Amino acid sequence: MNILLRLIVFALDPLGLGRRFLIRPAVNLGWNVYDRVRSKADEKVGTVRELVLRLGLIAFAVVLIIWLAVFMYAAFYYVYMPAISHTRPVHMQFKTCLETSTPCTFPHAHVSLTKKQQLLMVGQAYKVIVNIDMPESPQNLELGMFMVCAEMRDYDSMLRGHSCRSAMMRYRSPLIRMISTWVLSPLYVLGWKEEFQQVPVEIFSRYLEERQHPITDVYVEIQSQKIQFYTVTLHIVADFTGLRYIMFNWPVLSAIVAISTNLFFILVVFLLSWYHWSDAKWLHSVQIKYARLTKSLEPGVIHSKASSLRDDDDDLVAYSDKSDIADVGGDTLSDVDADDLVLVKKSRSGKRESPDALRKRPTKKTTADH
């Protein structure tokens, strides 16, 4: 097959002029064009890869910065903002008189806030409220005013706060009660509504928690033997002021402002760090100082430093010998002649010849005849 191709080529171009001046330049031109196209394609692929890599890095940096800003605000909100309220049921207890089957003592209860050391936040003001659900019975309507007292005690049962407040049911005239009863009678019949009033009694308006003596127990007492009630609950509500008030009442606005501020400061720190790390001169100097410090602690380096100091001493001795030789000869010597005249020979024991012995040696005349 190869022989046949060669014969065909020889028959078409016996002198090789076509191959030399037509085919070979065309093939070379084609290869050159192919190489250029391929190099440009590789460059484009490289630029596309670099562009994708840069975009990926920028996207990662943006996501990381936004996540850090959100995380910082969430962590600050979790640490700075306390729980808005704590609710505990109050189970009243009293002693019953055997003759009349009525309470002989005031209803009282012990409420355990927490088994831990602390429930409330130090420095935050709280409102302590006792809610009493009282039916609109004739006995409660005739009861009038009564007192509700509460004691705040710490883990060691030490008294940390005591307060009493008066309360009563809200007055409604017989006509208003009759009209409301007729209007709401379907709800009363279906059981969707009951005839009772919730009487809130604010025991403490601004109670402040102590760091050394946190409150763990509350003792509640209603100073009335004729009172009738369904349930009693204890509410401890945080009274926010200042920044906490803004963060609680306008959470979206405060979150936007705080996250934007965090983004600004994080971007400033990021740009300063980028500018600082882009200049590698200080890093190179630190590496050199660290290398010098680590090498100075190595015994081999210490030995080399000691040997260099000895070499410096030898140079000083040689220089002094040059000056001595110049003084003895009385003529001005060049540095080369002085180096030739200074003969510092070491014996096998490592001793030097003294300068006096060197002065006794015959010196050659270095002055030129004029």
From Swiss-Prot:
One MF term in the entry's GO annotations: channel activator activity
Tissues where the protein occurs: Widely expressed, with highest levels detected in fat body, moderate levels detected in salivary gland, midgut and muscle, and weak expression detected in brain.
Biased composition (Basic and acidic residues): 350-359
Classification via CDD domains: Seipin (cd23993)
InterPro entries noted in UniProt: Seipin
Membrane-traversing stretches: 56-76, 252-272
Annotated signal sequence range: 1-18
Domain of life, per lineage: Eukaryota
Phenotype of null mutants: Flies are viable and fertile with no noticeable behavior defects, but display reduced average weight. The size of the lipid droplets in larval fat bodies and the fat cells of young adults is significantly reduced, but exhibit ectopic lipid droplets in salivary gland and gut. Flies also display greatly reduced total glyceride levels and hypersensitivity to starvation.
Membrane topology (Cytoplasmic): 19-55, 273-370
Predominant location category: endoplasmic reticulum
Region (Disordered): 346-370
Cysteines engaged in disulfide bonds, as pairs: none
All ranges on the Lumenal side of the membrane: 77-251
Cellular component, GO annotation: endoplasmic reticulum; endoplasmic reticulum membrane; lipid droplet
GO biological process: diacylglycerol metabolic process; intracellular calcium ion homeostasis; lipid catabolic process; lipid droplet formation; lipid droplet organization; lipid storage; phosphatidic acid metabolic process; positive regulation of axon extension involved in regeneration
Keywords of this entry: Endoplasmic reticulum, Lipid degradation, Lipid droplet, Lipid metabolism, Membrane, Signal, Transmembrane, Transmembrane helix
Compartment(s) where it occurs, according to its Swiss-Prot or TrEMBL record: Endoplasmic reticulum membrane; Lipid droplet
Topological category with respect to the lipid bilayer: Multi-pass membrane protein
Annotated function: Acts as a tissue-autonomous lipid modulator, preventing ectopic lipid accumulation in salivary gland (a non-adipose tissue) and in promoting lipid storage in fat tissue. Required for the growth and maturation of small nascent lipid droplets (LDs) into larger mature LDs.
Protein name, as recorded: Seipin
Lineage summary: Eukaryota, Metazoa, Ecdysozoa, Arthropoda, Hexapoda
Protein encoded by which gene: Seipin
